[in-house]
């Protein structure tokens, strides 16, 4: 309203059109040097909820005359779990990936979007038919960005990066705090970790960051301890977790949580825990180290958990270890980036 009052209706509409036109012209010019190039990419992500079989995302990216087409034909059918990704989230993350490579300093608006065409198979993991469970869509929408970036690394390698962590390790833990006299107090708390970003040509990946569509921060250890009977024992960057390369990938985060009372229950999820799902290297760069989660019991023994774990019991002195994935490397380690 303020802009309309300042410039008038016609002046406002003219300026809006100019902004959209600028974005459209910019992305068309950015794509022009790559006209005629095409690349296909696939990645796998864990299910471990409805099935032990991983889920496949596939895309073929083709650059036309100032246009980009991303065809996701070959992507897995929707599944009976919350990992299905609503089409709006799919579109958002595909556009993000294109912007990150070709126009990182430009506005993402409808002028930019007009240059991009998406083919999204119906009844698929990235365009599910209602009713479909979508509560954990953020895991799959991260993978949408990842697979598009993997294709673009073949088309515009100087502008791209290797695979980043999309492991999104998170958990929730709850129960009754029985440390004090009187009626036990119910609590719930949790945390989310960042990890390693993929390297680019001539630039190492950032360590301990959220990537792509995620914007979460580590919860302060002091805040967590105020919330309930869970202590943050330690937080560290994991040495050697970034993929080797002329430019190495960023390092993962590991955090350790100790339970201070009995009878708690923990659930959570993460991705990129298997050799076939870890962040991918480019031009000879090494893969990022996998994510992991496990419990070390107070009485001894270590208990690895799968990528989706529900209702695991924890008691006083037990420790939960949560580790994200490292970013992948770029180029052979023996060569200059």
Regions found by a protein language model. Give the residues of each.
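Glycine/proline-enriched, intrinsically flexible loops and inter-domain linkers
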Residues: 1-337
């Amino acid at each position: 309203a303020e802009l309309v009052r300042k410039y008038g209706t016609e002046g406002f509409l003219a300026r809006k059109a100019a902004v959209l036109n600028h974005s459209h012209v910019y992305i068309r010019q950015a794509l022009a040097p790559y006209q005629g190039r095409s690349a296909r990419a696939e990645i796998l992500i864990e299910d471990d909820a409805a099935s032990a079989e991983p889920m496949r995302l596939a895309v073929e990216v083709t650059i036309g005359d100032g246009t980009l087409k991303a065809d996701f034909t070959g992507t897995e059918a929707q599944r009976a779990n919350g990992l299905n990704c609503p089409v709006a989230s799919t579109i958002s993350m595909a556009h993000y990936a294109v912007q990150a490579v070709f126009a990182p300093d430009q506005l993402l608006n409808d002028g930019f979007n007009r240059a991009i065409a998406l083919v999204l198979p119906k009844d698929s993991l990235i365009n599910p038919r209602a009713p479909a469970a979508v509560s954990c869509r953020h895991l799959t929408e991260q993978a949408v960005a990842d697979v598009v970036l993997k294709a673009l690394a073949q088309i515009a390698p100087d502008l791209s990066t290797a695979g980043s962590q999309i492991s999104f390790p998170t958990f929730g833990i709850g129960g009754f705090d029985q440390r004090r006299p009187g009626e036990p107090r119910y609590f719930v708390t949790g945390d989310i970790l960042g990890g390693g970003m993929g390297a680019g040509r001539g630039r190492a990946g950032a360590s301990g960051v959220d990537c792509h569509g995620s914007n979460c921060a580590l919860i302060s250890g002091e805040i967590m301890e105020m919330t309930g009977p869970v202590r943050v024992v330690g937080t560290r960057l994991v040495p050697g977790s970034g993929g080797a390369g002329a430019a190495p990938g960023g390092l993962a985060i590991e955090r350790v949580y100790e339970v201070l009372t009995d009878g708690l229950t923990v659930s959570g999820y993460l991705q990129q825990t298997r050799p076939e799902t870890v962040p991918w290297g480019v031009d000879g760069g090494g893969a990022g180290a996998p994510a992991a989660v496990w419990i070390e019991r107070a009485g001894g023994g270590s208990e690895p958990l799968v990528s989706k774990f529900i209702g695991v019991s924890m008691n006083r002195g037990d420790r939960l270890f949560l580790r994200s994935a490292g970013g992948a490397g770029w180029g052979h380690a023996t060569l200059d980036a």
